[in-house]
Design a protein with these regions (language model features):
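Active-site rim helix/loop that mediates acceptor-substrate recognition in acyltransferases
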Residues: 25-52, 182, 186-213, 217-218
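A short beta-loop-alpha structural element at the N-terminal edge
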Residues: 1-20, 155-182
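Conserved donor-binding loop and adjoining core beta-sheet/short helix segment
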Residues: 36-98, 102, 218, 226-236
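Conserved active-site alpha-helix within GNAT-family acetyltransferase domains
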Residues: 113-133, 254, 279-297
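Conserved acetyl-CoA-binding loop-helix of GNAT-fold acetyltransferases
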Residues: 85-100, 243, 249-263, 286-290
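Conserved beta-strand-loop-alpha-helix junction that forms the acyl-donor binding cleft
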Residues: 107-119, 245, 274-285, 302-306, ...
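Acyl-donor-binding surface of acyltransferase catalytic domains
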Residues: 1, 70, 82-154, 158-160, ...
């Protein structure tokens, strides 16, 4: 029993759970429906716990999924509220019950379907969460490409499966203190990055575009890389841009990105190129803006951001989020 409702295992009412999962997926923008459908898969294979939140005497119901991490707390992956009069207090009630049952909620999705973002934002900020918004962008197919810089001592070559260890090492240095690792599968930075790189190189969920996935060198030293993929919608996508922190700010990231865009333009001349970044990534945002990437409108949103607990963030080594830090890093 919670402050305003009851959280029960989905097995108590499987038919209602299935209906809500279907309604949840249909409520999302078309580009995000795969994220909604993933909930059913994760529930069936036991990857997430799933519950129904009901309020006695009320038609309101919420579908919620989460994962508990011993010694760390709870992460909420999905939330869908089906209510004639949705209230953000329903969210605070659910988080309170989950915190009591599984441990403090240190992270939750920002895709809180059925709730007003304008009402949820001040509530979560007051509860001590910081919003990490994803900015989905495209480089339009008809837009002229800036020239690849000829200054600098960088060289590039196509990435090969044998580069796995090199990519993991660059990633671990580049992602040290990265806040949204709290949304990654295992919360083990090296393990999660190793799994991601291995899956990308093996052509896992999305096809890797080898001709536009490049490794950058300063002399013989690998200093950065970009992975480009071809999602199911057929539009090329810059999936990962990583530069060793020791070489950041020297122009290698810009040169590498422009070289990749040049390769993608040659391979897919009539298609836009997608790229997503976290709004707090000020340096990345400046680079992508200067190159010519343009934000997509909200209704074409393709990725899901997060709300992360300040208490969890300040425990991350080298995290840029400190007590008193503003929501957008200011």
């Amino acid at each position: 029993m919670g402050l305003g409702g009851v959280l029960e295992d989905w097995r108590r009412d499987p038919s209602r759970t299935l209906r809500l999962e279907q309604d949840y997926a249909r409520s999302l923008p078309f580009s995000l429906r795969p994220y909604g459908h993933w909930l059913s898969h994760a529930r069936e294979f036991g990857e997430l716990k799933v519950g129904l939140w009901t309020v006695p005497g009320s038609p309101s119901v919420a579908l919620v999924s989460w994962k508990a991490f011993p010694g760390m707390g709870t992460r909420v992956s999905h939330l869908f509220v089906d209510s004639p009069a949705p209230s953000p207090t329903l969210l605070s009630d659910i988080l309170a019950v989950l915190s009591e049952r599984e441990g403090p909620v240190f992270a939750l999705t920002d895709l809180l379907a059925g709730l007003s973002p304008e009402e949820v934002r001040p509530l979560l900020q007051e509860m001590g969460y910081v919003h990490f918004e994803h900015v989905d962008t495209v480089f339009p197919s008809g837009k002229p490409l800036p020239p690849v810089p000829t200054t600098g001592h960088w060289s590039f070559r196509s990435i090969a499966p044998s580069d796995e260890a090199v990519l993991v090492e660059i990633s671990c240095r580049a992602y040290a203190g990265y806040e949204e690792q709290l949304m990654w599968p295992t919360l083990d930075l090296r393990r999660d990055l190793m799994d991601y790189v291995r899956d990308s190189l093996s052509g896992g969920e999305e096809k890797l575009i080898l001709g536009a996935s490049l490794l950058a060198f300063a002399g013989e030293v690998p200093v950065g890389y970009i992975l480009s993929s071809l999602p199911s919608n057929g539009n090329p996508y810059v999936a990962s841009v990583q530069v060793d922190p020791a070489f950041q700010g020297q122009g290698v990231g810009r040169a590498l990105l422009l070289q990749v865009l040049s390769e993608l333009r040659a391979l897919y001349p009539a298609q836009d190129v997608g790229l997503t970044y976290v709004r707090q990534n000020v340096r990345g945002r400046a680079l992508y803006d200067s190159v010519g990437f343009e934000p997509l409108p909200a209704e074409q949103r393709r990725t899901v951001g997060s709300w992360l607990s300040r208490k969890a963030l300040v425990s991350l080594p080298q995290s840029s989020v400190k007590p008193g830090w503003g929501e957008n890093g200011e």
